[in-house]
């Protein structure tokens, strides 16, 4: 165990620490998180429009008219379909904050650059036609959402890097001292803003002269498609989970670090399922953000709900009994920092093995269930990750009982994996407590005799 701890401390932790502190990954994570409140709000209306209750659709049609579902889709589209737009601003804002430059100006410039990179063409089907034509003059809503997420990420980081380099080299317009700070800041952004817009405009013109036709197409082919294949595969998902758990083992927030890389892929897959779910079509994706939040990591990273319940019900040592009482409440809402750092799992080889193995098992089992059709796929509904299991599995699948059943199976399997390791750890803690009592008891007896 000491050898394992030494390897973790000397080899893994320095690398993991540098990754965790990488400002671009942090900005990606924090910028995309900015979209979450909107997605959850949109998911609320998506659930209302697709409640799995017999006669519900007929009742709504009689009460609100035949177009009731289309009207409920308005807020869904307004929240989901600006994911890329919000990310373009949010990522640039967070990255500029980390560089210590004006974040608001950086976000606004990134937003303009993202719109500049987007072709203003929308598909249109004329009456009697058999093929869509592209009509200019309109912003394509689809490219403002998850389909434009990779372009938004790249432009946000590139534009902010250009912005901060020019600012840090002091190549800016300086206003007199009497000018209000807000006005002065806006003029400071003129030169870096012009540089960003000019470069993105030039890049768009160059790409339009190629078979790719747009920056969105070239990013999709060269970056989006390969990463989506990786993130949408069983092997890629297993690797992502293993890396996440190893980072946690070093005391780093693995979910945030890995999420900074994988979230764009999994959110894009979520939105693809949402679109298919709204249209009543077969759901195309299995590996979405909800797949991991709802089915894989039940109780928090490492699928530790089963471990906490075991601790609460079966612990013999005083320390584990007390920790189980404290941790069971948060664990129901998928918060497990109390046991990761309090048990601890961090830097603990005895518990590290099941902590890594358990989510790999739940990934595999859930994938088998969904790929065979025995379990419903996530319907693109952004159920909050803090929602307790069973309820979350039911809602995330659009009201399918199989989603809740799969969660129950994963909890049971997690218990089987964790139990023998927990028993060893609890036995060790119990022995330490008994040894401590044996040491303290003679000392207490001697004190009494001395007093007499």
Swiss-Prot record:
Domain PTS EIIC type-3: 8-421
Record membrane topology: Multi-pass membrane protein
Swiss-Prot/TrEMBL domain comment: The EIIC domain forms the PTS system translocation channel and contains the specific substrate-binding site.
Chief subcellular location: membrane
GO cellular component terms given for this protein: plasma membrane
Single biological process term from Gene Ontology: carbohydrate derivative transport
Compartments, record wording: Cell membrane
InterPro entries xref list: PTS_EIIC (IPR003352), PTS_EIIC_3 (IPR004501), PTS_IIC_cello (IPR004796), PTS_Sugar-EIIC/EIIB (IPR051088)
Highest taxon of source: Bacteria
Keywords, in A-Z order: Cell membrane, Membrane, Phosphotransferase system, Sugar transport, Transmembrane, Transmembrane helix, Transport
Name of this protein: Lichenan permease IIC component
A Pfam family recorded for this sequence: PTS_EIIC
Keyword Transmembrane assigned: yes
Functional note: The phosphoenolpyruvate-dependent sugar phosphotransferase system (PTS), a major carbohydrate active -transport system, catalyzes the phosphorylation of incoming sugar substrates concomitant with their translocation across the cell membrane. This system is involved in lichenan transport.
Expression induction: Induced by lichenan, lichenan hydrolysate and cellobiose. Subject to carbon catabolite repression.
Organism: Bacillus subtilis (strain 168)
GO molecular function, one term: protein-N(PI)-phosphohistidine-sugar phosphotransferase activity
NCBIfam families tied to this protein: cello_pts_IIC (TIGR00359), lacE (TIGR00410)
Chain segments annotated as transmembrane: 31-51, 72-92, 104-124, 138-158, 187-207, 218-238, 246-266, 291-311, 351-373, 402-422
Entry annotated with the keyword Transmembrane helix: yes
